[in-house]
Structure formats: C-alpha cells, structure tokens
Amino acid sequence: MRMKMFAAESLEAAKAMIFAEMGDDAIILSEREVPGGVEVRAATDKLGGGMVPSGSGIISRIGAPLTPRLTDNPLRNRVRDALLWHGAPQRFAERVADSGFASDTSVTDPTAAISAGLEKHIICRPIAPRLENDILLVGPPGHGRTAVAAKLTRRASVTKSEVLPVAADLDSTAGGAQLAAYLEREQDQIRSVSTPDALFETLKTIRDNKQRCVIDLPAIVPFDQEDMASLQDLIPVIKAEPVLVISAEGHPEDQADMAKAFARCGIKRAIVTKLDVTRRRGGIVSALSSAGIAFAHLAVTPFIGGGLVPATPNRLAQLLTEDAPAHVALRGAA
C-alpha cells in the first residue's frame, strides 16, 4: 500500500485531487484542518508512478519532529494548480510554486506567491518610450507586429518623443497601408519600403537625422529554415534591436519551440500580444522563460492608444491567478 498527503483549500478539492491521481479505489485515511485549507491522507494498493511515501517512518519512530514539506502547503498547491489551469507545463508550474514559498512560507496571497515565484524564473525589461536603439519587430504571421509598431509609435508621441514607423513591406502585403490605418495617417506619412536596398537607404537617412525608428518586418515562420536563416543574416546588417512579437495563443509546446527558434537568432526581448482574448496564459510565460527571452511589454487591449503595459512579475502574476481577466493588468498602459 502506498500513502500520500494531499493539501487543498477544501475537503472536496482534496478528494478531487486524490481520486484524479490515485483512482477511484483510493481510501481516505485521515483529514484535518490547517491554516488555509485541509490536509487529507489517502492510500491505494496501486503502485502508480506518482505515489510517494508521506513521510519517513524511521524519523517518526525515534520521535524526531517532521519538517513540514512545501508540497503540504495548500496555498503553494493552489499556485501550482492555477499555473496548470493556465496551461503551464507541470515542471514549470512546480518550480514557480516552490520558488514562491522558498524564501517566505508565510505568504498568504496567491498573486503575491506567483509573483515571488516568477521573479526567480523570468526577466522583465520594458522598452523605454524614448528609444535607446532602433527597434526591429519580428514574429510569426498573425501575432500582431504591425499593431505593436503602431502602439510603440503612439506611445512615444504621448511622452513627447518621436519614433518613426517604418513598414518593411518586403513581401508586398500592404504593410504600410495597414500601419497607416492603425495610426490614422495618410499612407504617404508612413515610411514604407519594398526592397532591402530601399530599407537600408531609409534607415541611413533616419540615422543621419539622429532619429529613432520602429521597423515592422514581414512575418517570419519560425519552423521554416530559410525564413530563420534570412532573419539571422538580416539582424546584424540592419543594426537595430530585434524584439519578438508573440501571441499568448497557441499550444505551450509550439510556443516554446517558437521562442527558442527566435532566441537562437539573437532575440533577447519580447512583447506578448492577445492577452485580452486568451484565457490560458501559462504556456507563453513558460516558453519565454525556457528560451531566456525577457518580457518587455504586455498587450492587453486591441486599442492602439494605451495598448502596452510594461511587463513585471506582479502584472504577469495577476494574469495567471486562475481565470483572471486581462484588464487586471492594464493599469500603467501607455
């Protein structure tokens, strides 16, 4: 027989965890109330891979006090379960949950616990409104690069600094017209180029005038070797910081593969989009963490004005607290 202790907010929640892991044949051995919830000990005759002994029998027999295990903390398990609900991989959810309580086991707020855990596993580096470098926006098709280019341009104008939008329409998809529409400008007010030579000439003029720009590059398919090779060749020639624009939508493993592919091309920062239409956001957080890419901004509304929020562990934690709406992290958008 194998035994295990389960911790949850309620007896019903604990039983659900027990039967999900041990099966319908599990037997409840004991239950007791603890701060923040209940602890329930259960047993089964099945030797499943997830079964672990509930404690050291030798230590118990000699009378030594048992050290409380982190996995017996109901709030810690709530943090883990919230991340799992959001689609985060099991190992990432466990690591964040453990890290959230590693330095302070007295934490009582789930958001604070998630935030503390994320601080150990992610990097946040927002882009300043007054750009230090030109920005080259890259990303897969349909992830919102052009909208982000417009948002960065609008954000700069609000803070009394100028950022010039450049549509690198190298694939002839009318990117300039779309960018102009987002910014409510005439198309001749947008710097739109259709060839690499025209792009380099435009960038030279902008830099000679000591101005900064945001370049909206055509979509890159991260699983296409030719696309990624072209991007890798282009980045050092353009001499602008490449920033990944990636949607919160999608399968966590696909997101992880995409993030790692762009990281291999030298991308260090990302702007996460479509958080307003995505309920489960754990996959993208884990993906960027595993790829070593820093969070720059979060796009939590479709509107061009006020559409970007500087990324922080606390803002991400608010988005990962179970079924949290995106607007909880909107404060501070620019």
Question: Where on the chain are the PLM-derived regions?
Answer:
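Non-catalytic terminal/linker segments enriched in charged/polar, low-complexity residues
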Residues: M1-A128, T159-S161, A329-A333
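Short hydrophobic alpha-helical runs that function as membrane-insertion/retention elements
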Residues: A7, A26-S30, L164-V166, Q189-V193, ...
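Pre-Walker A (Motif I) flank of P-loop NTPase domains
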Residues: R130-I135
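Switch II (G3) loop of P-loop NTPases
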Residues: V138-P141, V163-A174, A181, R185-S230
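Conserved lysine of the Walker
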Residues: R145
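Hydrophobic positions on the alpha1 helix immediately C-terminal to the Walker A/P-loop
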Residues: V148, L152, Q178
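Post-Walker A helix-loop "phosphate-sensing" segment adjacent to the P-loop in P-loop NTPases
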Residues: R155-L164, G292-F295
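Conserved catalytic-core segment of NTP-binding enzymes
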Residues: Q178, T195-K204, R212, I220-H327
